[in-house]
Amino acid sequence: MALQNIGASNRDDAFYRYKMPRMMTKIEGRGNGIKTNVVNMVEIAKALGRPAAYTTKYFGCELGAQSKFDEKNGTSLVNGAHDTSKLAGLLENFIKKYVQCYGCGNPETEILITKTQMLQLKCAACGFLSDVDMRDKLTSFILKNPPEQKKSSKDKKSMRRAEKERLREGEAADEEMRKLKKEAASKKKAATTGTSKDKVSKKKDHSPPRSLSDENDQADSEEDDDDVQWQTDTSREAAEKRMKEQLSAVTAEMVMLSTVEEKKPVAEVKKAPEQVHENGNSKIPENAHEKLVNEIKELLSSGSSPTQLKTALASNSANPQEKMDALFSALFGGTGKGFAKEVIKKKKYLLALMMMQEEAGAPAQMGLLNGIESFCMKASAEAAKEVALVIKGLYDEDILDEDVIVEWYNKGVKSSPVLKNVTPFIEWLQNAESESEEE
């Protein structure tokens, strides 16, 4: 199929990369039923990035004749006998009005319909927005039959989340399959050992027990199948050694627990000053938050993983929000410039605590936002300035949703310095949403 450059002004440019098929027409019927069939209208419309119904309707509007495009068969018919050159000239006018950018002339545009029912061409090359003349007859047809829009950033984000969820489900299914294989291998092992014992008892074979090397060889052969490991050494010395190791681990844990219990009363004695509430004379201990922060710091300094930290805090009597506030103080206390980068770096600890909040029935994302606000109210000015970067980073990581962020912002006090720093990000979110709706 012969190709030509898109746009009459680029006809002689041998290196022009935007091309479309040369128009091919065929006269069908006779008398009053004579029609012109544009044979390759689907290919032309695809090259222009416009629905074939638009170009067919444009021919009908300009020629004052009835036109019809059949979606099922892909046939484009215009009543009457028309020359190919005449239709090609009309197609060039369509390209100038509805395809080429009014700024740079490139055909990399898409049709946008604004809220005021106006048509615009958005150029992907230069970003220019071209206003289409709404006096043209085809504009009303386009408004009634809008083009299919590309997926917005919100749709892409939901697709990314669905893909991550699919991967998690696949990993869980693989893990379940591995467990089933291990169970089948263990049952097979038990059956084989049972039959061998029966044979030995029948023959009354008093041979010595298997050597350690034989058992190791058998264990190595079974490790090739799904990494199944079996206890091989059943001698008295090995059993005593294992008992000593277990006892040493248990005693070490008991010693650590006893030292922690001994340290707690000392800390309470040292931090005994009491604080008086502003709205009453009742005295409450000031160090409840600090005790929780110190406990988390001890866990972090001992190299606890996010899962271990979650397990340790699950037994604490503090409510979920108090735990989140204490975690921020323990993780980022004293942080100034670079607060946003530190939050993203240690996001796994935040996710672990959010999971614990969800298990307790508390709103996890709202608790995280409240924790950020509470920390920034007490943090340094440099850290408080980065609160918008923190929330945007968590939003980009799919930890926070747009709806929850806006809800948290609307519930807060707008005069708060933290919310003032977040305002530009909220405006950006709302503008991005309105632009996606317009598109």
Swiss-Prot record:
Segments forming domain W2: 283-439
Annotated region described as Disordered, given as residue ranges: 143-245
Record-linked SMART domains: eIF2B_5 (SM00653), eIF5C (SM00515)
Residues the record lists as Phosphoserine modifications: 434, 436
Organism: Arabidopsis thaliana (Mouse-ear cress)
Keywords: GTP-binding, Initiation factor, Nucleotide-binding, Phosphoprotein, Protein biosynthesis
SUPFAM superfamilies in alphabetical order: ARM repeat (SSF48371), Translation initiation factor 2 beta, aIF2beta, N-terminal domain (SSF100966), Zinc-binding domain of translation initiation factor 2 beta (SSF75689)
Family membership: Belongs to the eIF-2-beta/eIF-5 family.
This protein's name: Probable eukaryotic translation initiation factor 5-1
Keyword Phosphoprotein among UniProt keywords: yes
GO molecular function, one term: GTP binding
Positions bound to GTP: 29-36
Keyword NADP: no
Phosphothreonine PTM sites in chain numbering: 232
Residue spans of biased composition, Basic and acidic residues class: 147-186, 234-245
Source organism phylogeny: Eukaryota, Viridiplantae, Streptophyta, Embryophyta, Tracheophyta
Composition bias type Acidic residues, residue spans: 214-228
